[in-house]
Amino acid sequence: MGSVQLSGSGLVASLPPNHSFSHKTKLNKPNSYFFRSKHNAARTKTVRAISTAPASQPPAADEPDEPPAVDFAFVHSVLLPDGTPDVHWRRANGGQKLRDIMLDSNIELYGPYSKPLSNCAGVGTCATCMVEIVNGKELLNPRTDIEKEKLKRKPKNWRLACQTNVGNPDSTGLVVIQQLPEWKAHEWNIPKNIPNDDDLETST
């Protein structure tokens, strides 16, 4: 079983930035464009306009800013032939269930339990929508009581997608999700000293 670094080459690829290019030209002799000789003035009297343009046009309105959204990196359970993670990038608004985001984005969630009547359709009783949170835990709600019961024998960073809320409508950030963690062919090198929600609750 291979080991995947969170900062490895397969996941370092970030979303392409938005580039804006501007080019300014400088007139060497700006006054020459406004200079008119008598000969030119006479010629302009014989010229008839066939189309007109408004003397002044309002400045172009700035493009509206994109609404806040959360970026997702969904990592498939099977690596690519070259051994790198098979990552699928998605973007969605916060304030939604992780299950809804994955299904709406055509991300595999249930694996062999995707057939009708093979899962509870998001109620939280079957525990077949398990995912592993690799990064971005701070954008998610704490584990629910249902998760604590259903996942008590699973690693602390495993969640049920149907019980996981992703931030608020104005949230931004990156969440890295391991799909189908029970069938993954690799392991994540995640620091062990990161506190989890259960530890924080027991210490208070």
Swiss-Prot record:
What GO terms describe the biological role, i.e. biological process, of this protein? Answer: P450-containing electron transport chain; photosynthetic electron transport in photosystem I
Cell location: Plastid, Chloroplast thylakoid membrane
Q: What happens when the gene is disrupted?
A: Malfunction of the NDH complex.
**Where do the record's region annotations for Disordered lie?**
1-24, 45-68
Q: Where is the transit peptide?
A: 1-48
- Where the protein is mainly located, per its record? plastid
Task: Give the Gene Ontology MF terms in alphabetical order.
Answer: 2 iron, 2 sulfur cluster binding; metal ion binding
Q: Which residues bind [2Fe-2S] cluster?
A: 120, 126, 129, 162
Residue limits of the 2Fe-2S ferredoxin-type domain?
Answer: 76-180
Q: Which InterPro entries match?
A: 2Fe-2S_ferredoxin-like_sf, 2Fe-2S_ferredoxin-type, Adrenodoxin-like, Beta-grasp_dom_sf
| UniProt entry keywords in alphabetical sequence | 2Fe-2S, Chloroplast, Iron, Iron-sulfur, Membrane, Metal-binding, Plastid, Thylakoid, Transit peptide, Transport
Give the GO cellular component terms, alphabetically: chloroplast thylakoid membrane; cytosol; NAD(P)H dehydrogenase complex (plastoquinone)
Q: Subunit composition? A: Part of the chloroplast NDH complex, composed of a mixture of chloroplast and nucleus encoded subunits. Component of the NDH subcomplex B, at least composed of PnsB1, PnsB2, PnsB3, PnsB4 and PnsB5.
Question: What's its job?
Answer: NDH shuttles electrons from NAD(P)H:plastoquinone, via FMN and iron-sulfur (Fe-S) centers, to quinones in the photosynthetic chain and possibly in a chloroplast respiratory chain. The immediate electron acceptor for the enzyme in this species is believed to be plastoquinone. Couples the redox reaction to proton translocation, and thus conserves the redox energy in a proton gradient.
What name appears for this protein in its UniProt entry? Photosynthetic NDH subunit of subcomplex B 3, chloroplastic
